[in-house]
Every structure is written in structure tokens, then in C-alpha cells.
Amino acid sequence: MNGTEGPYFYVPMVNTTGVVRSPYEYPQYYLVNPAAFAVLGAYMFFLIIFGFPINFLTLYVTLEHKKLRTPLNYILLNLAVADLFMVIGGFTTTMYSSMHGYFVLGRLGCNLEGFSATLGGMISLWSLAVLAIERWVVVCKPTSNFRFGENHAIMGVSLTWTMALACTVPPLVGWSRYIPEGMQCSCGIDYYTRAEGFNNESFVLYMFFCHFMVPLIIIFFCYGRLLCAVKEAAAAQQESETTQRAEREVTRMVILMVIGYLVCWLPYASVAWFIFTHQGSEFGPLFMTIPAFFAKSSSIYNPVIYICMNKQFRNCMITTLFCGKNPFEGEEEGASSTKTEASSASSVSPA
């Protein structure tokens, strides 16, 4: 084994010199340059000061503007709540721990931080999958005479929480466990060991296939069908510049959505799978820390892609920030006037 395993921790360094210590009790500066902990803390601070305001503003603006409280927007609000879970429950703890060089909150704190951060991440991940399903259903209408309503939206939100809890509760009750990961300043699922009594192998397989591959397949299928439907509508109205413009915007948006999902989860899932299938191989603390950066950054670019680029949300946010007036209203109206012929296609687009 090219690491040191202890009670509820795994440090990616062989303890041949006797320097390895518990990440719950001692600074881990022997793992990487101490400056790396400062960089980690600064990055967490950056995510907090940008991630919290933009997600909180999303919720506040929705309360302020009744027209935003529509069933199709429920999942976007759920996405903002998920990001706030990550910011409040995960990023603050990681920043505080990085300032000390180790996970200072102990075993209980590791469980709470691992649960909160993973819960937020899983709600966010499943929200993107449900959002893809909702947009596919609304635009492609696979079922005739179907009308998307509040009950369907509530079912979608409930599904995200059910799947997220199905992923995050088991490590608290003995199916796998939360342990410090990477630079030992944040906690996550134990991909590193085959600790006796925790059945890590079965849980990691369950996580990878059910909570990564399934949402990925859903997103590719739904957005693939949606793009086909939009292109067919555009082909039927080739003389309409409006329809062509809407098609380009929807295509751009779908590409952004898929890339956003892959950038967020593919590095983390790939590295976790590699560690799981190559247990005993040598890898440094940064090997898991850097992919986690991508997953955590979703708290910023998810709102930008899915909320701030949504014309209705964007206008309401600007109106709220400018005390009831939108200084860009003329430009927005001029841009939107060219899209009236393609309302069904542009309903999937945030622009």
C-alpha cells in the first residue's frame, strides 16, 4: 500500500519515516508545500464570496417577482438551494480547515461536512438531469396532450432529494464512510480503502453507475432529442431568420449544459474510479484535490449557465439590483422582439 490507513482516514503517503499523523489532530504540511493550503483556502474564499450571493439572489429574486414562481422554474430554484448547501456546509469548512493545515473539526465534523457537501453536489447533479427531462417533455412532447404543471415540478424536485439522500445517508450508517480526502482538509466518500465492515466496493459501484452514469445518459438522451426537434422545426421554416436564430441559441445552450456537467463531474468521477480500481497504487494528495476543484466550482457556473443566462431571471435580477428599474430594458426588448416566431424552441433557451 502506497499510503497510510488509520481509524477513519487514509493519508496518501507511506509512513516509512514516521512523519504521517492523523489528519484530525495534526497539520498535514508534510504532504504538500504549505503554500498549497493557502491556495486552497483562497480558492474556497473565492467560491464563497461569488457562489453565495448569486445563489441567494436567485432565491430572493424569485420571492420578489411572482412571475418567476412557475413550475418550470422550480428545478432552477432547487439548483440554487443545492449550491447553497455546498457553499455553507462544505466550502466554509474546507476554508477553515485549510487555514490550519488539517481537518480541525474531528470525526463528527467530517461526517457533517462530507454529508452536506455531497448532498449539495448530488442534488445539483440530479437537478441537471431532471431539468433535461423537463425540457425534453415540454419541447418534444413525447406524450400527446401533456401539460407540465406544478405537481410534475414538485415530483421532479422530490426526485432530486430522494436520489441525493439515497447517496449521502448510507455512509453515515455504515455502508461506506466519509473520510478526509486529498490534502485532508475536506471530507468525501471513501474511494481509497477496502476497510473491513464498510463494504466500500459495492457502494462505489453503486455511486458510479447510479449517480453518475444514469444522469449522464439521461442528459445526453434528452438534449439529443431536443436538438433534433429544434433542428426539424428550423428546417421546416428555413426562410425564417427568427427560427434559425432560436435554433442556434438552443444549440449553444445545450452544448453549454453538457460541457458544464462534464467539466463538473467527469474529472472527479474519473479520478475516484481510478483510485478505486487501483487501490495500493501511488498517487499524491493533489491527485484528488484538483478534480474536486472542478466539482466545487459548479456552485458558480451552474447559476451562470442555468439562471443568469435565462432572460426572465436575468431581467428580474437586474430590476432588483437597480431598485425596481432595468437600465438595459430597451436593449432586452429589442433583442427579444426578433424571437417571437420561435417561442416553442426558445423555451429551452435561457437567452
From Swiss-Prot:
InterPro entries: GPCR_opsins (IPR050125), GPCR_Rhodpsn (IPR000276), GPCR_Rhodpsn_7TM (IPR017452), Opsin (IPR001760), Retinal_BS (IPR027430), Rhodopsin (IPR000732), Rhodopsin_N (IPR019477). Photoreceptor required for image-forming vision at low light intensity. While most salt water fish species use retinal as chromophore, most freshwater fish use 3-dehydroretinal, or a mixture of retinal and 3-dehydroretinal. Light-induced isomerization of 11-cis to all-trans retinal triggers a conformational change that activates signaling via G-proteins. Subsequent receptor phosphorylation mediates displacement of the bound G-protein alpha subunit by arrestin and terminates signaling. Coiled coil: none annotated. Its main location: membrane. Keywords: Cell projection, Chromophore, Disulfide bond, G-protein coupled receptor, Glycoprotein, Lipoprotein, Membrane, Palmitate, Phosphoprotein, Photoreceptor protein, Receptor, Retinal protein, Sensory transduction, Transducer, Transmembrane, Transmembrane helix, Vision. The modification N6-(retinylidene)lysine is found at K296. It is found in: Membrane; Cell projection, Cilium, Photoreceptor outer segment. GO terms for cellular component: membrane; photoreceptor disc membrane; plasma membrane. Disulfide bonds join C110-C187. This is Rhodopsin. Phosphorylated on some or all of the serine and threonine residues present in the C-terminal region. Contains one covalently linked retinal chromophore. Residues 335-351 have a biased composition (Low complexity). The record marks E113 as: Plays an important role in the conformation switch to the active conformation. It is a multi-pass membrane protein. A lipid is attached at C323 (S-palmitoyl cysteine). Belongs to the G-protein coupled receptor 1 family. Opsin subfamily. Glycans are attached at N2, N15, N200. It comes from the Eukaryota. It holds the Pfam family Rhodopsin_N. GO terms for molecular function: 11-cis retinal binding; G protein-coupled photoreceptor activity. It comes from Neoniphon sammara.
